[in-house]
């Protein structure tokens, strides 16, 4: 992405919105249960019904990430909560980590590992399936890995290992969120 594009999540920490639009859509929803951590997604979905919401990739912010364990938990629960928003309208975001291609790439990692394990233990035919999911994963993240290789080549191996880890965590978070939705959890309690 080299220019602003339509997006679905209103990122309250760094976003701009006119007072008029904010009031028209009703602002943040106070009925969202505490701890869900998806008020930005829910507000964004209401904004895009009648207004344009853009993400400008030329804006950059500095991220201060917590430690590894905290980041792992945050990713898991964040994706789990996002799944409740997703199940409301079954729409992926147009870009970023909640886009369809990113989701498929992340989901392919645990499936790749599953087929690799089955192939090594039981039948090598599963190794073929393993490579299919490896290709899906690589296709989803190849631009990122090229960027790392160009800008921080010494970080490439760590970025691949971290991506494998966090893709798995994201996948398990999505599955957990789907299970929560199936048993009745919703973004807004009725």
Task: Enumerate the predicted regions with their spans.
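Catalytic donor/gating beta->alpha subdomain of glycosyltransferases that bind UDP-sugars
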Residues: 29-94
């Amino acid at each position: 992405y080299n220019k602003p594009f339509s997006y679905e999540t209103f990122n309250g920490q760094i976003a701009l919105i006119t007072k008029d639009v904010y009031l028209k859509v009703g602002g943040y929803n106070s009925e969202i249960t505490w701890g869900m951590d998806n008020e930005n997604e829910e507000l964004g979905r209401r904004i895009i019904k009648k207004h344009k919401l853009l993400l400008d990739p030329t804006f950059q912010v500095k991220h201060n990430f917590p430690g590894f364990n905290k980041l792992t938990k945050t990713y898991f629960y964040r994706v789990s909560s996002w799944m409740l928003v997703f199940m409301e309208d079954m729409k992926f975001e147009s870009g970023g980590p909640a886009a369809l291609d990113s989701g498929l790439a992340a989901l392919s990692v645990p499936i790749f590992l599953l087929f690799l394990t089955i192939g090594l233990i039981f039948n090598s035919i599963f190794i073929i399936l393993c490579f299919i999911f490896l290709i899906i994963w690589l296709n989803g993240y190849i631009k990122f890995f090229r960027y790392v290789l160009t800008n921080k080549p010494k970080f490439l191996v760590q970025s691949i290992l971290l991506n494998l880890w966090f893709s798995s965590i994201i996948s398990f978070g999505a599955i957990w969120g789907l299970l929560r939705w199936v048993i009745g959890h919703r973004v807004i309690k009725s």
